[in-house]
Regions:
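Terminal-region recognition feature
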Residues: 1-222
């Protein structure tokens, strides 16, 4: 049985997350509390914990270091609970920090359970990378969701040598991201590079054709 306090202990003591940041993320991201009734017993818990009971992670915000640390802690915790049972990540994200997003991506690939991804609303930029990185055959999008890929954004200032160093790093990141998308979508690298030169928006059906998702969901299977 999932204990909502166990994840908090795992994240703060084992992973080293700030308790203040973790509580703030939980309280700001989702409806605070629900009442769960089972076999004549009633308990109050936050939606964050209730979803975790069903091995569901909800990423509904921009991706930064704080968010990535919490998502990674959830993935690692759920693997420790059951290394064979699937984990689902629901995505409605405009993207965000590339380094933070790549940290989530690497954790998704590293852990034993399959990670299914579901786009609800929008998966743009780094969000699109995470969407397509789900386990093959388990990447889905709701009917009216949107997926967008583009080249990483960045800027530099200072001495010419500093600008050159930053430029080289951005080019490395761009190649890494395009390689990831090409690998999971089965598209040619050149096509991904060409399409990502500017914002490339896709409907859910177009994302399926492109290889970003495997299925478009209209109604949840009974």
């Amino acid at each position: 049985m999932f204990d909502q306090n166990e994840f908090h202990k795992y994240a703060t003591k084992h992973i080293g997350l700030s308790s203040m940041h973790l509580n703030g993320y939980i309280e700001s991201s989702l409806t605070p509390y629900i009442i769960e009734e089972r076999q004549m017993n009633m308990t109050q818990m936050d939606v964050f914990s209730r979803l975790m009971m069903d091995r569901i992670i909800f990423l509904g915000t921009g991706i930064n270091d704080q968010v990535a640390n919490i998502i990674n802690a959830q993935l690692l915790f759920l693997e420790s609970v059951d290394p064979k049972k699937d984990i689902q990540i629901y995505l409605n994200s405009p993207g965000g920090g590339v380094y933070a997003g790549l940290g989530i991506y690497d954790t998704m690939q590293y852990i034993s359970p399959d990670v299914a991804t579901i786009c609800t609303g929008m998966a743009a930029s780094m969000g699109a990378v995470l969407l397509c990185a789900g386990a093959h055959g388990k990447r889905t999008a709701l009917r009216h969701s949107r997926v967008m890929i583009h080249q990483p954004l960045g800027g530099a200032q200072g001495q010419a040598s500093d600008i050159e160093i930053t430029t080289r790093e951005i080019l490395k990141l761009k190649k890494e991201l395009y390689d990831i998308i090409a690998h999971h979508s089965k598209q040619d690298y050149e096509k991904v590079s060409h399409d990502s030169d500017r914002d490339y928006w896709m409907t859910s059906e177009e994302a399926k054709t492109y290889g970003m998702v495997d299925e478009v969901l209209v109604r949840k299977a009974k």
